[in-house]
Amino acid sequence: MTLHRFKKIALLSALGIAAISMNVQAAERIAFIPKLVGVGFFTSGGNGAQQAGKELGVDVTYDGPTEPSVSGQVQLINNFVNQGYNAIIVSAVSPDGLCPALKRAMQRGVRVLTWDSDTKPECRSYYINQGTPAQLGGMLVDMAARQVNKDKAKVAFFYSSPTVTDQNQWVKEAKAKIAKEHPGWEIVTTQFGYNDATKSLQTAEGILKAYSDLDAIIAPDANALPAAAQAAENLKNDKVAIVGFSTPNVMRPYVERGTVKEFGLWDVVQQGKISVYVADALLKKGSMKTGDKLDIKGVGQVEVSPNSVQGYDYEADGNGIVLLPERVIFNKENIGKYDF
C-alpha cells in the first residue's frame, strides 16, 4: 500500500467516524417524566410516549420518582439536562416547585413541556392538557348528578393532594358548579390520599365511616377512585355514588360488580403520544404559535391554544396549551373496548 493511498483511507475513515459521531449527537432524546412510577395511569402515558418515539425515530426515556415529590422530579430533570437530553416533558407535582430547575433547563436550550399536571406557564413552553378545568370539573359533577337524584345531598371530594395543579383546578370548578346548579348539595369534607394506595384506602374508609349518610364521593385521582370503590365494598356500602377519574383497567372489576356505575378519563396513551409529537415538532421547527395545527398518527389533528383556556393570564410567544381532542365516560357498556 502506498503512503498516499494509506493517508486517503485514513482520512475517509476519520470522516466516516466523524459523520457517525455527528449523527449520534444529532439524535433527539426526549425525557418523559410522570409524577411517580408504579401507577397504571402514568405507565400508560409512558407507553404512548414511547410508541410516538418509535414512530418518529426519536429516543424517549420514561422515568420518574418512586414517590411524588418536588425533590425527586428536580433530581431527574437535572440529570436529564446534564445528560444532554433535547426535551423534557413532565407531569408536575407542584405548580411552582419545579420552576427553578425547568427555567435552568430552558436556559441551556432544552425544550420544556408539561403533560397531565401543569407548572406555572412561564416555566414551560406547552402544556399537553387533558381538558380545561371547566370541562373536567363539569364532567365530575354531571357524573355525580346522574346518580344523586335529589335536591339535598352530602358530597365528599377525595383526591391526591392540596398542592397538585390539575386536580385542584378541576375541584375548584366542580365546587363552583355545585354551588350554582345544586345549591342543596353539602360538601361535607375534602380529603387526600397523597398518591399512596394504602393511605388512600384508609382515607376512603375513614370518609365512609365518618359520613354514613354520604350520597357521593367525587374522586378525580387514579389512586383515590379505586380506593373509594374498594372502601365501599369493604364496608358493604352500596348506597354511595362513586365517580371520578382513573384508568379502565384499574376500574374494570368495580364497574363489572356494579360498585361504580360510571367514571371518566381521557385516553392517556394518546396524551403521552401527543406530548412527544409536540416536543418533536418544536425540536424540528423551532417554535409553534397559537392556532398552529399538528397531525398525529392514530389521533388526528391537535391545535395550539392560548393559556387563557386554562384560566391563566400569562401569554407569550412559543407558549400555550394543546388540548386532547376528547374525554371519555366509561360504564359497563363500553369499558370492554378500552385497554389501558
Swiss-Prot record:
Induction data:
In the absence of AI-2, repressed by LsrR. Induced by AI-2, via release of the LsrR repressor. In the absence of glucose, induced by cAMP-CRP by direct binding to the upstream region of the lsr promoter.
- A Pfam entry, by short name: Peripla_BP_4
Q: Where in the cell is it found?
A: Periplasm
Q: Which UniProt keywords apply?
A: Periplasm, Signal
- Which Gene Ontology cellular-component terms appear in the entry? ATP-binding cassette (ABC) transporter complex, substrate-binding subunit-containing; membrane; periplasmic space
Q: What is its main location?
A: periplasm
UniProt entry tagged with the keyword Metal-binding: no
Extent of the signal sequence: 1-26
Q: What does the UniProt function comment say about this protein? A: Part of the ABC transporter complex LsrABCD involved in autoinducer 2 (AI-2) import. Binds AI-2 and delivers it to the LsrC and LsrD permeases.
**NCBIfam families, per the entry:** PRK15408.1
Report the sequence similarity comment from the record.
Belongs to the bacterial solute-binding protein 2 family.
Subunit details:
The complex is composed of two ATP-binding proteins (LsrA), two transmembrane proteins (LsrC and LsrD) and a solute-binding protein (LsrB).
Designated name of the protein: Autoinducer 2-binding protein LsrB
> Lineage in the entry?
Bacteria, Pseudomonadati, Pseudomonadota, Gammaproteobacteria, Enterobacterales
